[in-house]
UniProtKB/Swiss-Prot annotation:
The keyword Transferase applies. Keywords: DNA-directed RNA polymerase, Nucleotidyltransferase, Transcription, Transferase. Homodimer. The RNAP catalytic core consists of 2 alpha, 1 beta, 1 beta' and 1 omega subunit. When a sigma factor is associated with the core the holoenzyme is formed, which can initiate transcription. It catalyses: RNA(n) + a ribonucleoside 5'-triphosphate = RNA(n+1) + diphosphate. Residues 250-338 are annotated as: Alpha C-terminal domain (alpha-CTD). Belongs to the RNA polymerase alpha chain family. Disulfide bonds: none annotated. HAMAP family: RNApol_bact_RpoA (MF_00059). Residues 1-234 are annotated as: Alpha N-terminal domain (alpha-NTD). DNA-dependent RNA polymerase catalyzes the transcription of DNA into RNA using the four ribonucleoside triphosphates as substrates. GO terms for biological process: DNA-templated transcription. The N-terminal domain is essential for RNAP assembly and basal transcription, whereas the C-terminal domain is involved in interaction with transcriptional regulators and with upstream promoter elements. The lineage of its organism: Bacteria, Pseudomonadati, Pseudomonadota, Alphaproteobacteria, Rhodobacterales. This is DNA-directed RNA polymerase subunit alpha.
Amino acid sequence: MIHKNWQELIKPTQLVVQPGTDPARKATVVAEPLERGFGLTLGNALRRVLMSSLQGAAITSVQIDGVLHEFSSVAGVREDVTDIVLNLKGVAIRMDAEGPKRVSISAKGPRVVTAGDISESAGIDVLNKDHVICHLDDGADLYIELTVNTGKGYVAADKNRPEDAPIGLMPIDAIYSPVKKVSYDVQPTREGQVLDYDKLTLKLETDGSLSPDDAVAYAARIIQDQLSIFVNFDEPESATRQDDEDDLEFNPLLLKKVDELELSVRSANCLKNDNIVYIGDLIQKTEAEMLRTPNFGRKSLNEIKEVLSGMGLHLGMDIVDWPPDNIEELAKKYEDNF
C-alpha cells in the first residue's frame, strides 16, 4: 500500500545523553538522524510537553504562627512574610506518593533557616537543602506549617485554597514542573552519503527530582500516548520478515558494524585494531577489557558507552552462540533494519 510510507522514513539510530556540570540536573540529549523537518517538529513538541506536562511536587500552602496574611511581618525575622513565601516557592521536592502531605519548620534565632530545616516525612525528600528561606535574629521563634502536593504545570494560588481553610492559611502558586529550563536546536547531519537529515539537540535542566534523560523519556511517552488515538488501523507485520527475525536468537542490531556508529577516529581505530567488527563483538567486552586495549582511554570508553546506551545496549552483555557461523550473510540480510 503506497500510503504506508512511514515504513520507509528514516528513524533515529542514535540517542546520546551528554551529562552537564551537574549530571543529576543538567544534560544535553542528541538524537539523529531524523527526516528533514522532523527535528523542528519533535523538538517543539518535546519542549512544550517537558515544560507543561510532567508530574512533580511543590509547596501549595503556608501557615506561620502569629501571622494572619502575607502582608505581615514576624518579630525577629529579617524578611517579611511575602519574601518568606517567595523563598518557599524555590524549594525543590521529590514526592514518592500522592499528596497532600503536611510538613513543618521549627527554628529559634539567631540562625539562617534553610530548606534543610523542613521536617522529615515519609515519601518526601527535599533536594536543595541549602536553599535559604529566611534569617532569624537573636530571640526570634519561628514555626511554619507547609502543605506539599503533587501535580503538573503551574497552578495559581486561588486554586490551592481548600474549602475549609483555617484563618492564617496562605495558599501559594505551585510550579510542579520538575523541568526548569529546556531549549532545542536543529542542525543538518548525514546518514551514509546523504546529508539532508536533521540532528536534534535538547538542552535541559531539572530541579533534581527527575533526571534529564528520564524527563525526555516521559515526555516522549506522553506524546506517543496522545497520538495513538489518531491511528485508525492495525499494521500487519510482514510474515516473512517476522519469521526471519524469530529465527534469530539475538537482536538483529548486533549485526551492525561498529564502523557505522560514527565514533571518533581514535575510538574507531582502537576497535579496528582489536578486531572488533560488529556491535555483537563490542558489547561482550567488559569495561576493564576495553581499557586494556592499546591507546583506548576513559574518554573513548565513555563515548562508546553513551552510543550503546542510546541503542538500549551496554558493555559486558552475554550473547549465546556468538558469532553465528554465517555472520556476514546475516549482516547483509538485516542491513535494511539498521
